[in-house]
């Protein structure tokens, strides 16, 4: 009997259970959307010196289509014909057991889409309003070449799926509770399409505690700069001699006496600090879609 143990990473495990209590939903789009919570696994019990490859699939659950009605999900008719679940091999390829067990194994590059014609290798096609469950499979590999991916079923070391990672694929969130949870727990979730939340994350104004009146960086006019003081013309026939200068007067350059060609004084900068709204360089997830 295999001693291999697979579990969900602690913080993600907690999130999956929170979402599962309300029947989790995942947005599918033509361009693909990443899963949240993340699929991040911990694997124990592998042979440290043997080679393994790890594969993820999103398998259909049941044979029904679902709809959200009366504040809850319910089955409504037969499911559409499902294609074979796409095999997503982990990007790390074939590695020793010691390497796989060194840290968590995350499938954060996977995206789900409702566009069946996509050729994107990281995209998985799902039918909207159908339920799916992630399934992790660990294969023993005869070669360390990342292109030698094992396929035969007799090389399977372990398979793991967790009921609380089930979700229904949707094109827009149906349950307001799920919408609220996504906003609360996903730092990149950007709110509603009605514009209540800004699409860009901004830091507050430096000049006061409120940024409600702060203009955007694109609309801010540049600060006015005081013109430089004009310098009197230099007489090329006047040359200074050091012994003629007062000890308290600075030596001027290039050709005039200090009192004939004073240097312009440097304008002092304003002590007041400009109010700035700064765009953070941060990857932003698409808007949260909701019904209606």
Swiss-Prot record:
Extent of Acidic residues compositional bias: 280-292
GO biological process entries: cell fate specification; embryonic body morphogenesis; positive regulation of DNA-templated transcription; regulation of DNA-templated transcription; regulation of transcription by RNA polymerase II
Protein's UniProt keywords contain Transcription regulation: yes
Cell compartment(s), UniProt: Nucleus
Main location as per UniProt: nucleus
GO MF assignments: DNA binding; DNA-binding transcription factor activity; DNA-binding transcription factor activity, RNA polymerase II-specific; RNA polymerase II cis-regulatory region sequence-specific DNA binding; RNA polymerase II transcription regulatory region sequence-specific DNA binding
DNA-binding region per Swiss-Prot/TrEMBL record: 10-194
Biased composition (Low complexity): 204-223, 265-275
Function noted in UniProt: Transcription factor. Involved in the control of early morphogenesis of the intestine, hypodermis and body-wall muscle. Involved in regulating expression of vab-7. Appears to have partially redundant function to tbx-8. Positively modulates expression of homeobox protein lin-39, perhaps by binding to regulatory regions of the lin-39 gene, acting in the vulval lineage.
Name the record gives this protein: T-box transcription factor tbx-9
Lineage: Eukaryota, Metazoa, Ecdysozoa, Nematoda, Chromadorea
């Amino acid at each position: 009997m295999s001693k291999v143990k697979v579990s969900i990473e602690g913080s993600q495990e907690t999130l999956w259970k929170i979402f599962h209590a309300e029947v989790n939903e995942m947005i599918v789009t033509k361009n693909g959307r990443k899963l949240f919570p993340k699929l991040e696994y911990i694997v124990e019990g592998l042979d440290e010196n043997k080679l393994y490859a790890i594969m993820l699939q999103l398998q259909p659950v049941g044979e029904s289509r679902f709809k959200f009605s009366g504040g809850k999900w319910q089955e409504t008719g037969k499911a559409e014909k499902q294609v074979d679940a796409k095999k997503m091999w982990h990007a790390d390829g074939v590695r020793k057991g010691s390497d796989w067990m060194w840290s968590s194994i995350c499938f954060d590059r996977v995206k789900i889409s409702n566009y069946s014609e996509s050729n994107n290798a990281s995209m998985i096609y799902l039918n909207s309003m159908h339920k799916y469950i992630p399934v992790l499979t660990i294969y023993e590999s005869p070669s360390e070449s990342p292109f030698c991916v094992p396929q035969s079923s007799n090389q399977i070391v372990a398979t793991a799926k967790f009921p609380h990672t089930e979700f229904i694929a949707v094109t827009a969130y149906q349950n307001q509770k799920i919408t609220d949870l996504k906003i609360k727990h996903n730092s990149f979730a950007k709110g509603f399409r009605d514009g209540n939340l800004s699409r860009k994350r901004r830091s507050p104004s430096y000049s006061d505690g409120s940024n409600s009146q702060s203009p955007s960086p694109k609309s801010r006019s540049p600060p006015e700069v005081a013109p430089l003081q004009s310098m009197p013309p230099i007489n090329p026939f006047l040359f200074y001699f050091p012994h003629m200068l007062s000890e308290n007067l600075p030596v001027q350059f290039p050709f005039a006496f200090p009192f004939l060609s004073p240097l312009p004084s440097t304008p002092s900068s304003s002590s007041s600090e400009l109010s700035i709204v700064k765009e953070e360089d941060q990857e932003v997830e698409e808007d949260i879609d909701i019904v209606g």
